[in-house]
Amino acid sequence: MILNHSAGLPALITRVNEGGFFDWDYMVELLENEEPFWTPGEHTGYHMMTTGWLIGELIRRITGKSLGQYFNDEVSEPYNLDYWIGLPESEVDRVAKVTPFKPSSNDKPSGFATAFRTDPDSMQKLSLTNTGKYDYNAKETYRAEIGGVGGITLSLIHISE
């Protein structure tokens, strides 16, 4: 259910405290206590932010390693990739800033975009705004192990080969 996005937790309804995305145990506890949007397994919805904690916590409980350490040990190091979940301080200056997407006035809004704009309680809106003031261009964000949206790479071509 986690890998196919049917766990029912694509976003958190419970308000995330400021800085909450940087506290692994806090985020796991929120997810453990969250009421699913649907009965797990019955529907799908993209778990863009939450998937990192859901998968990462399984990895931590099975291996004892954090998501970033596991990824480094099992993927980045063996394949000699510049790819991190939790960027080392030594690499921070290599990161390009993310620029938000700005649709053209001719673009027809997707169902996701329509829900995001019109329903403040939708999973679409909550998944992108209930983030504890997460800033994807902050150095602390680069260093955090936020698996759903925190992977940083210079090795995409190697991953796809």
Feature map (PLM): residue ranges:
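Short, surface-exposed loop or secondary-structure junction motifs
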Residues: 1-160
